[in-house]
Amino acid sequence: MSFDSLLDKNDKLVKVCGIQTVEAAETALQAGADLIGIICVPNRKRTIESAVAREISKLIHKSGTTKLVGVFRNQSVEDVHRLSEEYDLDIIQLHGDESWPEYYNVIKKPIIKRVIFPRDVDVVTQVCQRKPLVCLPLFDSEAGGTGEKLDWSSISSWASEQNNVFYILAGGLTAENVMEAVGLPGVIGVDVSGGVETDGVKDNDKIIKYVQNAKKQ
């Protein structure tokens, strides 16, 4: 699988990340999310339990459309590969300092690679030129999942000056601002976690509203 087929079917990819329950996954699925993310980094507040991850995987793969994304950060290729098989992940998201080709060459699944603006803009331009499209860049904060909004103005100015660059945007997204986000230059996807939570727990109403608003464009 590459991202080409996904993007052929969707104008924008809508991702809900940090899912920890089957109920939240089902809500995101029914709302129309294209990507559902689970945190596979140990000892984080949103780290998925193995048994729940397997249940969510079964649910998602019955849908036939939504893809399951496993999020990792500076973990070994071996560990990522093992969990990729155990959870039947469709896509691997690397949120640390990894060299994404090293992981892709072993795991053979599409990669979402977290990049920092403006430090990693060269990575973005390189990735966007590859065919087939097996890696998508994702602009987010260093830690991710913090609710920190990025500098949309600077990113938009940079993207407008480039030739055919695209990226997933994360960081500080909510149902209230996602319609603006999907209209920014270069944005082909949006990614939310904390922005659809209430008191640190996924909020079904917020998930539904977020996905609906993201899909309105």
UniProtKB/Swiss-Prot annotation:
Catalytic activity: N-(5-phospho-beta-D-ribosyl)anthranilate = 1-(2-carboxyphenylamino)-1-deoxy-D-ribulose 5-phosphate
Extent of the signal sequence: none
Database matches in SUPFAM superfamilies: Ribulose-phoshate binding barrel (SSF51366)
GO biological process: L-tryptophan biosynthetic process
Gene3D superfamilies associated with the record: Aldolase class I (3.20.20.70)
Keywords from the UniProt entry: Amino-acid biosynthesis, Aromatic amino acid biosynthesis, Isomerase, Tryptophan biosynthesis
InterPro entries linked to this entry: Aldolase_TIM, PRAI_dom, RibuloseP-bd_barrel, TrpF_fam
Pathway connected to this protein: Amino-acid biosynthesis; L-tryptophan biosynthesis; L-tryptophan from chorismate: step 3/5
CDD domains according to UniProt: PRAI
EC number: 5.3.1.24
Protein name, as recorded: N-(5'-phosphoribosyl)anthranilate isomerase
Natural source organism: Candida glabrata (strain ATCC 2001 / BCRC 20586 / JCM 3761 / NBRC 0622 / NRRL Y-65 / CBS 138) (Yeast)
High-level lineage: Eukaryota, Fungi, Dikarya, Ascomycota, Saccharomycotina
